[in-house]
């Protein structure tokens, strides 16, 4: 049975459509093939292994909760583990959605075609619809593999721990594992569709220069939001559920993580009326996210190809960018020399590259969150620390060069001339 399937897969990959799908898959997960790339990239094996780690570690974090000996020692007898495990179900849902959302935001530029794709594929006798369908197929395959990889370990171990504590049979374990797999997979796919739909809609509606200007900040907002979702997973959904029971019209009902928690409990027949109501929002919410993703993908694909032909203005020609540079130049040294030149060059390099802008925007977002939660005296210190941390991360990211730079600076290592510029 396997050899015919293997032969069919090999023949499919050798077709022009199969080669296109393989090309787009490699571009989604390639590691270090593009010298001008500013992303921190990993190979396929390292990426899949890294993405599987959070779920695996989380399983062993919650293992003591389902120890039969500890339950007996604490005097907890005859517990309904389908209800006891509710916070952990929410934790795994939040973890799956967080990892999926962060990777989708970071890989956003690799999902749509870039100038290299157009220059390589446009001269070939291939219809644009075939290229679009091949890219869509590659995205679907990548999302499916990604969803399975992120949730593979928790799908086995978490139901095993819960059913072992409840001392039930194999049938209940299989049912629990199937329910867990369905809910976390649906949450993973929904997160990808939602992030893609929102970013794609902004890309399709906003002018190209406006989207390029605000893309880094929008992605940073998504990253901060997903980090907050992860924190809520460790704190538990109890506060959300209490607020929802007290105020059914609360904005909390629009949290997708609670939708899938309600679906989880409904499939196991342990849902409260509030959770049962939230479970009904999974279908319309998922359908809306998928529809927006398909529409924005088609429009964004066409606009990205048009952008390659038309080109774009340099960042230095944009008015807002020029005003920001003039303001930041006020912090440089007044006297001409290496320190002033190094400061001006570093500022422009940090604001020019997408990865550096995202790093700074995430630091500013976390700083705002820390300032909102801390008192008036501690807020400036927390914000300044996170901003310095974001700058330090930005210094470690490589800056992509659009052309070969012929200028070099020869420095005396004993003078440490770059330190004053970095401090400014």
Please place each PLM-identified region on the residue numbering.
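Transmembrane helix boundary and interhelical loop/hinge segments in multi-pass membrane proteins
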Residues: 103-124, 391-410
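Transmembrane alpha-helical segments and their membrane-interface loop/helix boundaries
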Residues: 1-101, 146-391
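Membrane-cytosol interface motif
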Residues: 126-130, 314-323, 412-413
């Amino acid at each position: 049975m396997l050899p015919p399937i293997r032969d069919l897969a090999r023949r499919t990959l050798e077709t022009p459509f199969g080669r296109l799908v393989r090309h787009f898959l490699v571009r989604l997960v390639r590691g270090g093939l593009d010298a001008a790339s500013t992303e921190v990239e990993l190979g396929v094996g390292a990426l899949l292994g890294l993405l599987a780690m959070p779920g695996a570690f989380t399983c062993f974090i919650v293992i003591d909760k389902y120890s039969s000996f500890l339950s007996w020692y604490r005097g907890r007898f005859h517990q309904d583990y389908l209800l006891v495990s509710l916070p952990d179900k929410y934790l795994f849902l939040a973890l799956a959605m967080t990892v999926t959302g962060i990777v989708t935001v970071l890989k956003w530029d690799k999902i749509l075609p870039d100038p290299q794709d157009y220059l390589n594929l446009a001269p070939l006798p291939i219809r644009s619809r075939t290229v679009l369908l091949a890219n869509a197929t590659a995205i679907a395959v990548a999302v499916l593999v990604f969803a399975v990889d992120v949730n593979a370990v928790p799908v086995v171990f978490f139901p095993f721990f819960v059913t072992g504590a409840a001392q039930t049979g194999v049938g209940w374990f299989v049912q629990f594992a199937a329910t867990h797999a369905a809910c976390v997979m649906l949450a993973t796919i929904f997160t990808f569709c939602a992030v893609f739909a929102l970013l794609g809609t902004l890309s399709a509606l906003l002018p190209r220069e406006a989207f390029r200007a605000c893309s880094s900040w929008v992605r940073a907002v998504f990253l901060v939001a997903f980090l907050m979702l992860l924190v809520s997973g460790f704190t538990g959904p109890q506060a959300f559920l209490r607020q929802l029971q007290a105020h059914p019209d609360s904005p909390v009902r629009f949290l997708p993580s609670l939708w899938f928690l309600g679906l989880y409990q409904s499939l196991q027949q342990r849902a409260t009326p509030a959770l049962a109501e939230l479970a009904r929002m999974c279908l319309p919410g998922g359908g809306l996210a998928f529809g927006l993703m398909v529409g924005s993908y088609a429009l964004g694909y066409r606009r990205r190809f048009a952008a390659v032909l038309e080109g774009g203005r340099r960042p230095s020609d944009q008015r807002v960018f020029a005003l920001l540079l003039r303001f930041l130049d006020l912090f440089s040294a007044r006297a001409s020399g290496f320190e002033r030149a190094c400061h001006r060059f570093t500022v422009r390099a940090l604001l020019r590259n997408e990865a550096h802008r995202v790093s700074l925007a995430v630091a500013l977002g976390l700083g705002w969150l820390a300032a909102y939660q801390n008192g008036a005296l501690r807020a400036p210190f927390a914000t300044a620390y996170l901003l310095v941390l974001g700058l330090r991360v930005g210094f470690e990211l490589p800056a992509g060069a659009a052309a070969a730079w012929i200028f070099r600076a020869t420095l005396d290592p004993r003078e440490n001339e770059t330190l004053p510029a970095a401090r400014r």
